[in-house]
């Protein structure tokens, strides 16, 4: 490709958007049409409905054709320019050095048409929470354009030698186990609660009464619903990350996965701001870890829950893969770090007493209105206190900070847990807080801010000694 190029999206972008809008419009018209009719629809009614639906589809088609024909993408003076000359003219210019990721995606329709969606993300704080540019091209053209952009925004020379490439892949069995370990504790407890509540009904089931038969069938359906939900979660994770592969090539990591929606990420290593190791409760019991990376571009889409990097595996395998793919982070699994200290219990107790002082009068008024007596006033606070004590204790055991020479590690969680590894140079800024009780015990909590999508930008720091926080401030400077 030459510099100062200018082109449009592939024309299939029109049909892709028309299909989405038409599907929504048809669904709305159909539901309203059916609910409003008291009798079976006549041929005239059906023709009117079809006419309105076709008119809407044609209107959307014409509008999308106008947008497509008057939208141009070009590269001018080391910048990517997107021009939209429709009713409202808009020109968006992005400096190529500010591009953090160049990613490829394919849904089923795009696979059938042989096209590919190319997504660009910037590494500026103002646009870190959204994908800036979506470009649809033929697959080969998209791959060429991707490599062209990577060449323009590279920070180091890309090594193409096969001896320098480091590859990792996951088998179908490993991806299936990843889906299993992704199940959270809440889902398991909810399922056990449902089964526990309906099992007595099943045991007492008689063979005579219709009402009992109805309750029996309903109970079975409820169990099937919840079990099916968990099975679907495992299946969804399996299908989403099937055919997973990751490759380190030069100064970039290339990540791809999925069969229903094929995703290809290109991640410049110098744009990775943190590495996060996650564990659900099941994963903690099985001593498994999954890896996410914190940067701009990954995990922005609503359907993507994580900035996925490596699936759940044993500690030894994860350590080996991270050493091969991201040796710059020098992640040490054995570092436990400094805990919060017993003074944190005084802070939590003070906060709890304050909330109880607000809650008990409200419960007393509610009990008087509902005529429940003192049961509500006593039982609700006791249950809340027990729940909070369990959460606080698990947090006390889990939350730690380790300050190394070049990076810090934050460990937090309750039943699930995560470890965040951050280089000091990647921290945008810190904020520290200290209440009266915390000041008396010489502890502080805070937040650190990274350049990332909105949900990964802010990370909490647990209560730590003031000396530890001062050391952290010194290292960030």
Positions of PLM-derived features:
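N-terminal basic, Ser/Thr-rich segments that initiate or prime the first beta/alpha elements at protein or domain
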Residues: 1-477
């Amino acid at each position: 490709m030459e510099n100062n190029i200018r082109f449009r999206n592939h024309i299939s972008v029109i049909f892709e958007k028309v299909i989405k809008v038409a599907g929504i419009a048809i669904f709305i018209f159909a539901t309203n049409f059916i609910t409003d009719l008291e009798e079976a629809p006549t041929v005239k009614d059906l023709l009117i409905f079809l006419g309105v639906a076709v008119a809407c589809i044609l209107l959307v088609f014409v509008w999308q054709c106008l947008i497509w024909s008057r939208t141009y993408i070009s590269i001018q003076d080391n910048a990517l320019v997107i021009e939209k000359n429709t009713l409202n003219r808009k020109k968006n210019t992005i400096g190529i050095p500010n591009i953090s990721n160049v990613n490829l995606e394919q849904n089923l329709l795009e696979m059938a048409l042989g096209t590919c969606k190319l997504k660009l993300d910037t590494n500026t704080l103002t646009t870190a929470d959204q994908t800036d540019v979506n470009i649809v091209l033929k697959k080969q053209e998209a791959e060429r354009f991707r490599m062209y952009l990577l060449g323009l925004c590279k920070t180091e020379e890309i090594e193409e030698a096969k001896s320098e490439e480091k590859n990792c892949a996951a088998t179908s069995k490993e991806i299936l186990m990843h889906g299993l370990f992704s199940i959270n504790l809440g889902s398991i407890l909810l399922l056990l609660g449902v089964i526990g509540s309906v099992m007595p009904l099943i045991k007492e089931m008689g063979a005579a009464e219709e009402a009992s038969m109805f309750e029996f069938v309903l109970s079975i359906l409820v169990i099937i619903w919840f079990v099916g939900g968990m099975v679907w979660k495992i299946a969804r994770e399996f299908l989403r990350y099937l055919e997973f592969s990751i490759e380190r090539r030069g100064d970039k990591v290339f990540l791809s996965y999925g069969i229903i929606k094929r995703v290809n990420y290109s991640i410049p290593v110098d744009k990775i701001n943190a590495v996060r190791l996650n564990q659900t409760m099941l994963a903690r019991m099985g001593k498994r870890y999954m890896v996410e990376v914190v940067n701009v571009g990954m995990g922005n889409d609503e359907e993507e829950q994580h900035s996925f990097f490596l699936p759940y595996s044993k500690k030894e395998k994860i350590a080996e893969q991270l050493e091969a793919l991201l040796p710059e982070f020098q992640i040490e699994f054995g570092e436990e770090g400094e805990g919060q200290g017993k003074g944190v219990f005084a802070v939590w107790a003070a906060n709890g007493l304050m909330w109880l002082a607000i809650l008990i009068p409200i419960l007393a008024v509610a009990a008087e209105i509902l005529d429940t007596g003192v049961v509500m006033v006593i039982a609700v606070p006791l249950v809340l206190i027990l729940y909070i004590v369990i959460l606080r204790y698990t947090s006390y055991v889990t939350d730690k900070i380790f300050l190394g020479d070049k990076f810090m590690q934050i460990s937090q969680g309750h039943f699930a847990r995560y470890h965040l590894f951050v280089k000091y140079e990647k921290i945008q800024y810190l904020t520290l807080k200290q209440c009266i009780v915390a000041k008396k015990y010489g502890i502080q909590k805070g937040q650190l801010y990274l350049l990332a999508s909105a949900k990964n930008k802010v990370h909490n720091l647990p209560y730590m000694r003031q000396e530890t926080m001062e050391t952290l401030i010194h290292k960030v400077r």
